[in-house]
Amino acid sequence: MEDIVIVGRHAVKEAIISGHAINKILIQDGIKKQQINDILKNAKSQKLIVQTVPKSKLDFLANAPHQGVAALVAPYEYANFDEFLQKQKKKARYSTVIILDGLEDPHNLGSILRTADASGVDAVIIPKRRSVALTQTVAKASTGAIQHVPVIRVTNLSKTIDELKDNGFWIAGTEANNATDYRDLQADMSLGIVIGSEGQGMSRLVSDKCDFHIKIPMVGHVNSLNASVAASLMMYEVYRKRHQLEEKS
């Protein structure tokens, strides 16, 4: 398989720190070394190959703003679902997974991974068919979070939901109608939160598998939110419920 190109100083730094298999670091000719000192220091400590290249080569490889640095990395590996379940059984806290039903926009997936990392989500689950995969665009949009959040790719989303439920998870599906306000979501349980596709929402089969449905109230003129925005609201509502503010003295 071909290398994936990661671009941008923060994303490259996170890739190095995470220990992902990096084949080569590419640095733009003429860039000031103090601007990428952390990258060079970490690359040296891991004995990575660092090559200086013309800006034109980075422009060609990245096809996006690259800040003068790129990393050629091995394709991202997906986490194993069974191994994930075993790890969750050993945890002394409730778990949270985000289940993406047919999400196709790589920028949305990258943004969801970024918020998932920030809010302590344990994994993101995507189906193999009719869904975005882990790509260079996803990596860039995640600003490094792709290195820290397990992404599980499954053949049958409906069956996976059944297995989650068998292992103590409650499944909450996001719907626009006939659903409970998401602010009433109970978080004292392990949760799987389903986010539907940008255009169609959840599939009927997946919706029927949900234990309950939640909605985000809207009082404006639009009737839906971007998938990554909706997911972010859900993730931080769970975080808020589980991490109460300490009373100020």
Curated annotation (Swiss-Prot):
Keywords: Methyltransferase, Transferase
GO molecular function: RNA binding; RNA methyltransferase activity
Keyword Iron included in the entry's annotation: no
SMART domains named in the record: SpoU_sub_bind
Taxonomic superkingdom: Bacteria
Database matches in Pfam families: SpoU_methylase (PF00588), SpoU_sub_bind (PF08032)
UniProt cross-references to SUPFAM superfamilies, sorted A to Z: alpha/beta knot, L30e-like
GO biological process entries: methylation; RNA processing
Enzyme class: transferase
GO cellular component: cytosol
Binding of S-adenosyl-L-methionine, residues: G196, I216, L225
The EC number(s) this enzyme carries: 2.1.1.-
Protein family: Belongs to the class IV-like SAM-binding methyltransferase superfamily. RNA methyltransferase TrmH family.
NCBIfam families: rRNA_methyl_3
UniProt name for this protein: Putative TrmH family tRNA/rRNA methyltransferase
Species this protein is from: Staphylococcus epidermidis (strain ATCC 35984 / DSM 28319 / BCRC 17069 / CCUG 31568 / BM 3577 / RP62A)
